[in-house]
Amino acid sequence: MPLVACDDSLLTVIDLQPRFWAERLDAEDKRRAEEAARRAAWLAAAAHALGVPAVITEEDPEINGPTDEAVLAPLRASAPVFTKTVFGLADCPEIMAAVRSTRRRTALLAGFETDVCVTHSAVGLGEAGYRVVIVEDAVYSPFGAHLPGIVRLRDLGFELMHCKNVYYDWIRTLPAARAFQEHNPELAHPPGFSL
């Protein structure tokens, strides 16, 4: 499998809505969910800085609230936000039209929940012919469902990558990495890992 090319990548941020973790989770699940959300926000900002388009979904925002502001901030001007009432984004024609309009063939998935909406979206995108990459440190499911979701995704044949792996696949060279960090100092120290 080749490296993930920046100019062929599309970031899909799936249901990264704080109400999924702010009120319903115990302390450990909440900590892990917040960590995944911070990494997804960093990835969204890095994607924006590198010209990688994004599509954002929200599940039932009247109940679950809007997408995390840290994710929306860098993407607000360029990424469409879609409400969905199905678990897999590929089952929504308007979302798939936005995905297709990017003309990118590699879909990177971040968001919630690993075992349901992320998995259903991965399967649908895969069936539509996309190379699907799960950014495993930027997805999460509570109540012990995260690891089984990751295992299922792996067993289904989807690629699993860390935010750091994605960054270096996108950047490719030391001069490009130095230039990125110089032009984006706020992204030079990502949450929970080093560049």
Regions found by a protein language model. Give the residues of each.
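Active-site-adjacent betaalpha module
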Residues: 2-10, 50, 62-195
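A short alpha/beta connector and helix-capping loop motif
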Residues: 7-9, 24-55
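N-terminal nucleotide-binding beta1-loop-alpha1 segment
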Residues: 9-17
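Short acidic, Gly/Ser-rich segments with clustered Asp/Glu that frequently serve as metal-coordination loops
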Residues: 17-23
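Glycine-rich N-terminal segment of FAD-binding domains in flavoprotein oxidoreductases
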Residues: 58-59
